[in-house]
Amino acid sequence: MHLSPQEKDKLLIFSAALLAERRLDRGLKLNYPETIAFLSFQVLEGARDGKSVSQLMSEGTTWLTKSQVMEGIPEMVDEVQIEAVFPDGTKLVTIHNPIN
């Protein structure tokens, strides 16, 4: 299988996000890499589902709460940026203060 660097990055994000989802399901708190992967995956899948940039920016602040991440993570993650493919091209999605 021949994958571009971007495709490899997306697979890595997917793997880490899947691990994060499973840990959340078990009641475990996410660490920094798991948090970033989880949020990034939600953006990538939302774009694939046809959601707009503004929808994802708005919804992005509801995906995780402070009780779902380890202490100090909300302060470390004040912004998440990820490029996602939309029907009209690739766009940068920025979520400010994603953990409430």
Curated annotation (Swiss-Prot):
Signal peptide: none annotated. GO terms for cellular component: cytoplasm. Its EC number is 3.5.1.5. It comes from the Bacteria. GO terms for molecular function: nickel cation binding; urease activity. It catalyses: urea + 2 H2O + H(+) = hydrogencarbonate + 2 NH4(+). Coiled coil: none annotated. Pathway: Nitrogen metabolism; urea degradation; CO(2) and NH(3) from urea (urease route): step 1/1. It holds the Pfam family Urease_gamma. Belongs to the urease gamma subunit family. Heterotrimer of UreA (gamma), UreB (beta) and UreC (alpha) subunits. Three heterotrimers associate to form the active enzyme. This is Urease subunit gamma. The gene is ureA.
